[in-house]
């Protein structure tokens, strides 16, 4: 299959590291697991062909420690490095170091990561490629106050001030009237300079009640690009996704084709390679591009379930220089899939709940998939993200996917630590969720936050 990649180093941990290991195994590729001192007992570390400890528990000293990861790749004769999601996956400097050190980076080119990582240049690139964007300042705001106020009137209030280097809900501020605009810009600038070392800010229309809908794309190194349809990730708490599904309720075949084609065309125009996701806000029938994730996403399984495409395997094959194995006409959405993220956290306070899992039982049955690295006796460390797994169900339609999810959540047993399974069960029974098409603020309202 991929003649040139004999060995992959997995620069990540937890469920995604295990997911990557399984894809490598299927392709007959040897694996190297790098891990922190706290992660010696991770499932993929125990399963990998080789493992290398790269540092102490804190991520800064291990999973974000570039020299340690590169030297682990060197001592194991690794051919390619898969960054997973989070950690170094969208770090252009890391991708560059990987390639300069003679390894294949399983992801886009460093310059593409850089282009899409800067919100201002990303939006400019997407506009040029014909992807619909949120009306805004078309670049950073300058010091001309009169022009800034005029522009804000044109866009229309409410307006969001965003810092160019921010993300994940940080470095942004909503302004409802002209009176507070200039002050808000100054505050956001100061915060951005302190947090991201970059005081560039821009403004865009603030959509009051949008849904979060994203499109999955795949592009090879020969300039071919396709989209795999959309996912709805509107069930969020504090900008963190909780439930994701594919396809998005109420999106028409025309909309899917139009926006999906534009995303694929944008990939071709920026020379994208690998798997990627275009995130949109969707309100009143309109899509507005917000950002592109240049990596595999947590919620990729829902797209895999409805399209039958193994996204992680495709990432590896693309990195090996293989052409895409699918044409756009091969991609059909079949049925409906839902994913619930399972977190080790207190159901009421949402505080992380690390500790030893004394008992774990995974659900089963038709159309049920679980992606998790936990097992009975495994200790969830306190140093990393609280997500310990993902439960995915697939059914012939949304109703049957939900019914299967309800069963799967009921069957899942995780003892010894707290989890958000109770929350997920209540979402699956919630009227607005069952109706489909809830907006991104709905879950916080439902929880009374």
Curated annotation (Swiss-Prot):
A GO term for molecular function: ATP binding
Keyword ATP-binding listed: yes
InterPro entries: ACC_Biotin_Carboxylase (IPR051602), Acetyl_CoA_COase_biotin_COase (IPR004549), ATP-grasp (IPR011761), ATP_grasp_subdomain_1 (IPR013815), BC-like_N (IPR005481), Biotin_carboxylation_dom (IPR011764), Biotin_COase_C (IPR005482), CbamoylP_synth_lsu-like_ATP-bd (IPR005479)
Residues the record lists as binding ATP: 119, 162, 168-169, 204-207, 212, 239, 279, 291
SMART domains in alphabetical order: Biotin_carb_C
EC supergroup of this enzyme: ligase
Biological process terms in GO annotation: fatty acid biosynthetic process; malonyl-CoA biosynthetic process
Pathway: Lipid metabolism; malonyl-CoA biosynthesis; malonyl-CoA from acetyl-CoA: step 1/1
Binding site for Mg(2+) 1: 279, 291
Binding, hydrogencarbonate: 241, 295, 298, 341
Alphabetical UniProt keywords: ATP-binding, Biotin, Fatty acid biosynthesis, Fatty acid metabolism, Ligase, Lipid biosynthesis, Lipid metabolism, Magnesium, Manganese, Metal-binding, Nucleotide-binding
Residues that coordinate or bind Mg(2+) 2: 291, 293
EC number(s) on file: 6.3.4.14
Keyword 4Fe-4S: no
Pfam families found in the cross-reference section: Biotin_carb_C, Biotin_carb_N, CPSase_L_D2
Superkingdom, natural source: Bacteria
Note accompanying the cofactor annotation: Binds 2 magnesium or manganese ions per subunit.
Membrane-spanning residues: none
Annotated PANTHER family: BIOTIN CARBOXYLASE, CHLOROPLASTIC, PYRUVATE CARBOXYLASE SUBUNIT A
Quaternary state and interactors: Acetyl-CoA carboxylase is a heterohexamer of biotin carboxyl carrier protein, biotin carboxylase and the two subunits of carboxyl transferase in a 2:2 complex.
Protein's UniProt name: Biotin carboxylase
Species: Allochromatium vinosum (strain ATCC 17899 / DSM 180 / NBRC 103801 / NCIMB 10441 / D)
């Amino acid at each position: 299959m991929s003649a040139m990649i004999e060995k992959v180093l997995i620069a990540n941990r937890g469920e995604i590291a295990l997911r990557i290991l399984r894809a490598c195994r299927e392709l007959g590729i040897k694996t190297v697991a790098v891990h922190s001192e706290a992660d010696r007992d991770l499932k993929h570390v125990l399963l990998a062909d080789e493992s290398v400890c790269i540092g102490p528990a804190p991520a800064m000293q291990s999973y974000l420690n570039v020299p340690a990861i590169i030297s682990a790749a060197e001592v194991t004769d690794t051919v390619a490095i898969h960054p997973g999601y989070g950690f170094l996956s969208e770090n252009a400097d890391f991708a560059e170091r990987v390639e300069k050190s003679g390894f294949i980076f399983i992801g886009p080119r460093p310059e593409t990561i850089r282009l899409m990582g800067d919100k201002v240049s990303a939006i400019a690139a997407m506009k040029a490629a014909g992807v619909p964007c949120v009306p805004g300042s078309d670049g950073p705001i300058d010091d001309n106050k009169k022009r800034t106020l005029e522009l804000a009137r044109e866009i229309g209030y409410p307006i969001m001030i965003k810092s160019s280097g921010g993300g994940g809900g940080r470095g942004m501020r909503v302004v409802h009237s002209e009176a507070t605009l200039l002050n808000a810009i100054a505050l956001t600038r100061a915060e951005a300079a302190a947090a991201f070392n970059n005081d560039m800010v821009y403004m865009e229309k603030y959509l009051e009640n949008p849904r979060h809908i994203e499109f999955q794309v795949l592009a090879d190194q020969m300039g071919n690009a396709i989209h795999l349809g959309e996912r709805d990730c509107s069930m969020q708490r504090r900008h963190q996704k909780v439930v994701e599904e594919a396809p998005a309720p109420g999106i028409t075949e025309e909309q899917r084709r139009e926006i999906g084609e534009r995303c694929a065309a944008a990939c071709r125009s920026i020379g994208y390679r690998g798997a990627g996701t275009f995130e949109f806000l969707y309100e009143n029938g309109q899509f507005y591009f917000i950002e592109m994730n240049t990596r595999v996403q947590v919620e990729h399984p829902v797209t895999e379930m409805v399209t039958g495409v193994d996204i992680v395997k495709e990432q590896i094959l693309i990195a090996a220089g293989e052409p895409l194995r699918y044409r756009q006409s091969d991609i059909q959405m079949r049925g409906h899939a839902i994913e619930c993220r399972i977190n080790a956290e207190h159901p009421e306070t949402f505080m992380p709940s690390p500790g030893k899992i004394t008992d774990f039982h995974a659900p089963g049955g038709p159309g049920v998939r679980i992606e998790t690295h936990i097992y009975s006796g495994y200790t969830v460390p306190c140093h990393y993200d609280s997500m310990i797994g993902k439960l995915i169900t697939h059914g012939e339609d949304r109703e049957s996917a939900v019914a299967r999810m309800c069963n799967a959540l009921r069957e899942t047993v995780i003892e010894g630590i707290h989890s958000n399974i109770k929350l997920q069960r209540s979402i699956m029974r919630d009227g607005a969720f069952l109706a489909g098409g809830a907006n991104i603020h709905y879950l916080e309202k439902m929880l009374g936050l």
